[in-house]
UniProtKB/Swiss-Prot annotation:
Task of the protein: Involved in light-induced chloroplast development and growth. Involved in the plant response to abiotic and photooxidative stresses. May be involved in the suppression of photooxidative damage.
Membrane-spanning residues: 267-287
Species, as recorded: Oryza sativa subsp. japonica
Subcellular localization, as worded in the UniProt entry: Plastid, Chloroplast thylakoid membrane
Region (Disordered), start-end ranges: 1-119, 206-225
Protein name per the record: Protein CHLOROPLAST ENHANCING STRESS TOLERANCE, chloroplastic
Entry similarity comment: Belongs to the Y3IP1/CEST family.
Biased composition (Pro residues): 1-15
Coiled coil: none
Length: 292
């Protein structure tokens, strides 16, 4: 029976080696925080335990030694004072009331002069007249204003005139829209040109001819007898009478004037008798010459 030898003791552990931290990590780790007024004052910060406090002190001493070996100043002991909270490069945000006031001041339009108000009244008066006399809507007036004279376009092209500050037809249309909406146009030059052009509208005061209340007979229906009674045809088709075949006794009396039949056919007889008269005259002249 073999004797059991006592267990051999475990081999001794090698001593721990401490490696200095790299300068990049050291700079990141030792950057001063703006949240603390003093770099090493931790009196007001509660530590979770005594072990953590010891570990923190050891790490602080280690950072000091590494910084001294690299020839750098200790970042934590710098004399630079940290600005208190709320101060620094960043300016305090502007209040919403101040910003709204600036926007309102910039958006405020200059006061309108009496000439501008007179131009606006002229434009509105012309719009009312066009709607009353010409039955034109605002869209039709706007499209008419936007049409540019082709003669002006050709003249500018031949002369090479290109003025970027010139008032265009679109500017006039925008001014017309603003006047129609009850606002004062910002472009006062466009307002003046618009008022001048609107007042020079041709035949502005002349009223449009009134349309007939009932459609009358067309020229073809008056001159041609189709042999179809329009009233009977409309009853069979169950539709309204066609304007080309509508019979209106009152309109017929107004349009047609009574002419005697003798006067009407006399012109036809006279034109027909001219060749006969000429032929008879030639025969008589020849017969008279033959007798001599």
């Amino acid at each position: 029976m073999a004797l059991l030898s006592p267990p051999s003791p475990p081999p001794p552990l090698p001593p721990l080696r401490r490696r200095p931290a790299s300068p990049t990590l050291l700079a990141v780790a030792t950057r001063p925080s703006s949240l603390l007024s003093l770099p090493h004052c931790h009196c007001g910060l509660p530590l979770p335990s005594t072990a953590n406090a010891r570990a923190y002190s050891r790490s602080s001493r280690r950072r000091r030694r590494v910084a001294a070996s690299l020839g750098q100043d200790e970042p934590g002991v710098s004399d630079t004072a940290v600005a208190p909270e709320g101060e620094g490069d960043s300016e305090p945000p502007a209040s919403s009331d101040g910003a709204a006031g600036d926007i309102a001041a910039s958006a405020e339009q200059p006061e309108a002069s009496p000439e501008d108000l007179e131009d606006i009244r002229q434009v509105k008066r012309v719009l009312e007249l066009l709607q009353k006399n010409r039955d034109m809507t605002f869209g039709e007036v706007k499209l008419t204003i936007m049409i540019e004279d082709p003669r002006d376009i050709e003249r500018k092209r031949l002369l090479g005139i290109e003025d970027p500050d010139e008032i265009t037809r679109d500017d006039l249309a925008d001014a017309l829209v603003e006047v129609n909406e009850g606002r004062i146009p910002e472009n006062r030059v466009a307002l003046q040109l618009l008022a001048k052009e609107m007042t020079e509208w041709p035949d502005l005061e002349m009223e449009a001819p009134k349309k007939k209340s009932k459609p009358g007979k067309s020229v073809y229906a008056k001159a041609t007898d189709t042999g179809i009674d329009p009233e009977t045809a409309a009853k069979r088709l169950n539709i309204d009478w066609d304007s080309a075949a509508d019979l209106d006794d009152e309109e017929e009396e107004d349009d047609e004037t009574e002419v005697p039949s003798a006067v009407g056919y006399s012109a036809l007889y006279l034109l027909t008798a001219f060749p006969v008269i000429i032929g008879i005259s030639v025969v008589l002249i020849l017969f008279y010459n033959s007798l001599q």
